Amino acid sequence: MTQSLVCPDTVSRVSSVLNRNSRQFGKKHLFDQDEETCWNSDQGPSQWVSLEFPQCVQITQLQVQFQGGFSSRHSCLEGSRGGEALSKIVDFYPEDTNALQTFSIPTMEVDRLKLTFEDTTDFFGRVVIYHLRVLGEKAG
């Protein structure tokens, strides 16, 4: 059964936070299901989010909701398991829209993920994400 794989024991990291204001724009807002909060990166050539799961998971879908004008035209999902080096799972190409976008992911068992957001629509390279959902199943 497909479910959200991000849990309280999932360790998340981000490339940057706008003005280092984690309280208002921090990574916790990626997963809080609140329409009023977001992760807002600082400027830079590319931005990323990494996730370390407490156990192996099988990812089937990724859902991302950007703020229009602060999205990524090209994104890359990488994963690994058991301390191995990250390897590319898939490239995906989000639209510059406020809508929640769903991307099917080739099924792969991982305990670590990294999403890299490249070619941002913002001139300064900032990314704003209201929702990030990693869907799939816990590996058994």
Curated annotation (Swiss-Prot):
Its main location: nucleus. Belongs to the NR2C2AP family. Signal peptide: none annotated. It comes from Mus musculus. The keyword Nucleus applies. InterPro entries: Galactose-bd-like_sf. Keywords: Nucleus. Interacts with NR2C2/TR4. One of its GO terms (cellular component) is nucleoplasm. This is Nuclear receptor 2C2-associated protein. The keyword Nucleus applies. It is found in: Nucleus. May act as a repressor of NR2C2-mediated transactivation by suppressing the binding between NR2C2/TR4 and the TR4-response element in target genes.
